[in-house]
Amino acid sequence: GDLPPNIAELFDQFVERKDLLTEAERNILRYYIYGHEISEIPDLAFISMSTVRKHNRSIYEKLGVASRDELMLYIDLLRRCGRLQELF
């Protein structure tokens, strides 16, 4: 069925905020969407772990989440609702 309006609004706001991300931050987000762990990203993206952490902080701030766990929760819920493609 349909999502409760307040939950749908949270998802809408989260998805809209993705437009605030830089291309590099979007790439990091994609790695998370595809199920990669933070420890894998430096090798995949050819960047240092400190750069990944810097991007993470910026991603969390721009998307309005407090942690990677919260980010992954949004990703999982969007996947379950069939809305994950909206993050691309």
Predicted regions and their residues:
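Recognition helix of helix-turn-helix DNA-binding domains
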Residues: 35-70
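Phenylalanine-focused residue identity feature
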Residues: 11-14, 34, 46, 88
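Regulatory hinge/linker segments at domain boundaries
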Residues: 2-27, 84
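N-terminal start-of-chain detector that recognizes signal peptides
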Residues: 1-3, 31-32, 44
